């Protein structure tokens, strides 16, 4: 974006001496050196990264500041609303409530971004470490865990690399906040940073290397909720003074839905995720969900199309597995992925301008602190000092007056004792076993309904019995 200097000053000051003493190559040059195994119908022999033309400089002044009426949800503390022209705001919200996919090539998207004034953005990455990753690669990854680290890259490694190749060109300083969620230390309540003291990754090469180091240290768990990672992204945007960001979530499945959830109703995890997406639409933040593994993805497509009451359509779902399994050249598949991920960004960025969301703080966004990286044994370093706050941003325009942050604390779940492991659901590792399958194995009623095969013996599930 046009506020690169202040953003760069902040990010460089936040980046520790480690990165200052060892500059890393760009993500594009790094990714171009990677080689990949067979995935679907094509082999992963990457061509040189695509060349992005430098877009014209955006010369328009930043939009004027005015107050917005905050989204009112039980978990958020909002300041009093102010009158600022509600009719015009409602008109703009109707205009951007559903953004269509209007482009057929990556060049068209790049040109549209330039016309909208978006020379660059800031990427945030979130990665799903829930238990379902152990069986959602049954068809697409030869029945192995999607997080299996071996001689050939797993789907998460492939997605990280291709995102680094195709989307990193739109990140202005190559410093990427990266977080994990859904493991035994975070469940559906928190996120952990890929680096200690919440240091950002220096390009996607460090994202990939830290991913490989972290996976053996953690314990997959659940349930699945995207609310914590979206909350973390909102904290970053708020502390940047309202700079435009794109949150890329790489996940293997949709949000946990309990068997007790009635048709037309949302589970607690679904409701919190919807609330977070709606709240994020009050900020200059776009959300791209990249789906890896077998799915299912019907609820994510529903999130993409039909979440109500948003200031603008800020959510895009991309089925990575489906695109990468197509019988076409690898370069064409990469272009299709980048196009799918960026398709709505030009209109979303334009919406943040017209809704006057850029360049100011809201003052009512909950401040979230990430946990430190997990240690061997499946838990974060609980006895380590409290992680430091995110580094201070230097906004390019005076921040919106605030009344102080409402800090929402998330309790750290205690490590599960080995004596009680047998009584807990083997998927989420938090709920008691209260559903049995025909094979005799058991899970909880939240995890069981979404399974097609038993996670223990892999037998097809034909009978589900709720235990009382």
Swiss-Prot record:
Its main location: membrane. A zinc finger (RING-type) spans 425-458. InterPro entries: Copine_C, E3_ligase/Copine_domain, RING-HC_RGLG1/2, VWF_A, vWFA_dom_sf, Znf_RING, Znf_RING/FYVE/PHD. Residues 1-89, 369-416 are annotated as: Disordered. N-myristoylated. Residues 46-65 have a biased composition (Pro residues). PROSITE patterns: ZF_RING_2. A lipid is attached at residue 2 (N-myristoyl glycine). Residues 122-342 form the VWFA domain. It is an enzyme of class 2 (transferase). Ubiquitously expressed. Keywords: Abscisic acid signaling pathway, Cell membrane, Lipoprotein, Membrane, Metal-binding, Myristate, Nucleus, Stress response, Transferase, Ubl conjugation pathway, Zinc, Zinc-finger. Interacts with the heterodimer UBC35/UEV1B, UBC35 alone, PIN1, but not with UCB2, UCB9, UEV1B or UEV1C alone. Interacts with ERF053. This is E3 ubiquitin-protein ligase RGLG2. It comes from Arabidopsis thaliana (Mouse-ear cress).
């Amino acid at each position: 974006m046009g506020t690169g200097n202040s953003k760069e000053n902040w990010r460089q000051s936040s980046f520790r001496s480690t990165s200052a003493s060892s500059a890393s190559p760009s993500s594009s040059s790094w990714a171009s050196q990677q080689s990949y195994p067979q995935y679907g119908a094509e082999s992963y022999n990457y061509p040189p990264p695509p060349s992005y033309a430098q877009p014209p400089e955006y010369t328009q002044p930043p939009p004027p500041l005015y107050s917005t009426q905050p989204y009112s949800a039980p978990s958020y503390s909002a300041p009093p609303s102010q009158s600022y022209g509600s009719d015009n705001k409602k008109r703009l919200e109707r205009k951007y409530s559903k953004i269509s996919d209007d482009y057929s090539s990556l060049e068209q998207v790049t040109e549209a971004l330039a016309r909208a004034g978006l020379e660059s953005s800031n990427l945030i990455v979130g990665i799903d470490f829930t238990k379902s990753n152990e069986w959602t690669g049954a068809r697409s990854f030869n029945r192995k865990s999607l997080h299996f680290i071996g001689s050939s890259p797993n789907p998460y490694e492939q997605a990280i690399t291709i995102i680094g190749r195709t989307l990193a060109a739109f990140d202005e300083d190559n410093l990427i906040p990266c977080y994990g969620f859904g493991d035994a230390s975070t469940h559906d309540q928190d996120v952990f940073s890929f680096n200690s003291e919440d240091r950002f990754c220096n390009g996607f090469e460090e994202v990939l290397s830290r991913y490989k180091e972290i996976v053996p240290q953690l314990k997959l768990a659940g349930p699945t909720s995207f609310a914590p990672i979206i909350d973390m992204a909102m904290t970053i945007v708020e502390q940047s003074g309202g700079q435009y960001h794109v949150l890329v979530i790489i996940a293997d499945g949709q949000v946990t839905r309990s068997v007790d959830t009635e048709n037309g109703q949302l589970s607690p995890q679904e409701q919190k995720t919807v609330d977070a997406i709606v709240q994020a639409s009050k900020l200059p933040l776009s959300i791209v969900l990249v789906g890896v593994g077998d799915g299912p993805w019907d609820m994510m497509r529903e999130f993409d199309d039909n979440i109500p009451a948003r200031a603008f359509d800020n959510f895009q779902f991309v089925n990575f597995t489906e695109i990468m399994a197509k019988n076409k050249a690898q370069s064409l598949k990469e272009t299709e992925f980048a196009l799918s991920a960026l398709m709505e960004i030009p209109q979303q960025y334009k919406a943040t301008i017209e809704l006057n969301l850029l360049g100011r703080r809201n003052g009512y966004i909950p401040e979230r602190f990430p946990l430190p990286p997990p240690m061997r044994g499946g838990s974060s370093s609980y006895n380590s000092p409290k992680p430091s706050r995110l580094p201070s941003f230097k906004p390019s325009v005076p921040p919106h007056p605030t009344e102080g942050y409402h800090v929402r604390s998330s309790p750290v779940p205690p490590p599960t004792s080995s004596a009680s492991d047998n009584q807990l659901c083997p998927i989420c590792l938090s709920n008691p076993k209260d559903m049995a399958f025909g094979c005799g194995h058991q899970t909880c009623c939240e995890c069981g309904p979404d399974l097609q095969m038993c996670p223990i013996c892999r037998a097809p599930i034909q009978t589900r019995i709720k235990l009382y």
